[in-house]
Amino acid sequence: MPRLLIAASGTGGHIFPALSVAEELPESWDISWLGVPERLENQLVPTKYDMTVIPVGGLQSKGLRKYFQLLKLILAIFFVIYLIKRKQIKLVFTTGGYIAAPAIIASKLCGINVILHESNSYPGKVTRLLGKFCDEVALGLPIAAEKLKRCRTIVTGMPVRKSFSLKNPLPIWVPKGLEPLIVVMGGSQGAVGLNRMVRESLPWLLKQGYRVVHITGKYDKPSNINHKNFVEKSFTEEIPGLLQHADLAISRAGAGALSEFAICSLPVILVPYPYSSDHHQDANAAYAAQFGAALIVHEDRLGTHVLTRALENLLATNRMSSKYKSDDLLNKMRIGMTKLAIKDANQRLISILQRYV
């Protein structure tokens, strides 16, 4: 029986790819999960995977706190070594982030294989530092290989949930009508700044008759906007059906969201999170824009004005409820998104894992 330890923690961009792979592995695999206390994985990872949590954080702190974080990392490494031996783990799979550091180091000290998946176009710090110790580094976006020349890289694409490969109905709570449907997504970390920009653009959107679904994230207060063509939710599990029936998205530029838009061939206006580590969301957005798949609007004092103008340019001159014209910008963006998609990413990663057990 193959025994796999998955180390994935923090944001949806780390957790959802790992979950997507885990759910499609053969039932004969014994899967354990390594996470961090009070992080998103404690809510999302099914109970069928034995979850172990350990305190670990980044080393970017200063002063005494940096030494405290280093001590936590050392203790975490020893704990993962103990976990690997106790559970007789044969392979470790990680999606980067803080939890990847003790998982990778412990794996090498125990002499077992470790596979890392890097989703972003600009690799995270742990990937850049420890990727060379991994047996393979699977890439969500090919451009990431430029920063990982000492690593054994392979392009797999970004795994997405199996439900995205199915035809899903439009959620019943979405406003009904033939007018274009615009979906706003802030990502697992929420997006207070993005939400503000969108709310300031809403009067124009609703005046034009467009339908708007706004997924705000849990860290923002609900608005007081009441309109038949507007629905606001902090979270929904019906994202596949929502995106498959949408005409345009407005979103942060996380790698997970980009992969879902690509699978759905959904044009998007990207508003990169300005405080993302190493500005990786800016890099993700720029990569999507190279394919003509996205427009980029930055979150700054002019952001709302620029967002409204972008929406006007995309929507005002053509009604998306009719078929796309070949020369429409939205149609060109849809084609660009299709080129960005790697639809067999899940199977590519599973094939790699199966080679190492």
UniProtKB/Swiss-Prot annotation:
Function, as annotated: Cell wall formation. Catalyzes the transfer of a GlcNAc subunit on undecaprenyl-pyrophosphoryl-MurNAc-pentapeptide (lipid intermediate I) to form undecaprenyl-pyrophosphoryl-MurNAc-(pentapeptide)GlcNAc (lipid intermediate II).
Metabolic or biological pathway, per its Swiss-Prot or TrEMBL entry: Cell wall biogenesis; peptidoglycan biosynthesis
The protein, known as: UDP-N-acetylglucosamine--N-acetylmuramyl-(pentapeptide) pyrophosphoryl-undecaprenol N-acetylglucosamine transferase
BP terms from Gene Ontology: carbohydrate metabolic process; cell division; cell wall organization; lipid glycosylation; peptidoglycan biosynthetic process; regulation of cell shape
Catalyzed reactions per annotation: di-trans,octa-cis-undecaprenyl diphospho-N-acetyl-alpha-D-muramoyl-L-alanyl-D-glutamyl-meso-2,6-diaminopimeloyl-D-alanyl-D-alanine + UDP-N-acetyl-alpha-D-glucosamine = di-trans,octa-cis-undecaprenyl diphospho-[N-acetyl-alpha-D-glucosaminyl-(1->4)]-N-acetyl-alpha-D-muramoyl-L-alanyl-D-glutamyl-meso-2,6-diaminopimeloyl-D-alanyl-D-alanine + UDP + H(+)
Biological source species: Prochlorococcus marinus (strain SARG / CCMP1375 / SS120)
Positions bound to UDP-N-acetyl-alpha-D-glucosamine: 11-13, 120, 161, 188, 281
Protein family per UniProt: Belongs to the glycosyltransferase 28 family. MurG subfamily.
One Gene Ontology term of the molecular function aspect: UDP-N-acetyl-D-glucosamine:N-acetylmuramoyl-L-alanyl-D-glutamyl-meso-2,6-diaminopimelyl-D-alanyl-D-alanine-diphosphoundecaprenol 4-beta-N-acetylglucosaminlytransferase activity
Enzyme Commission number(s) from the entry: 2.4.1.227
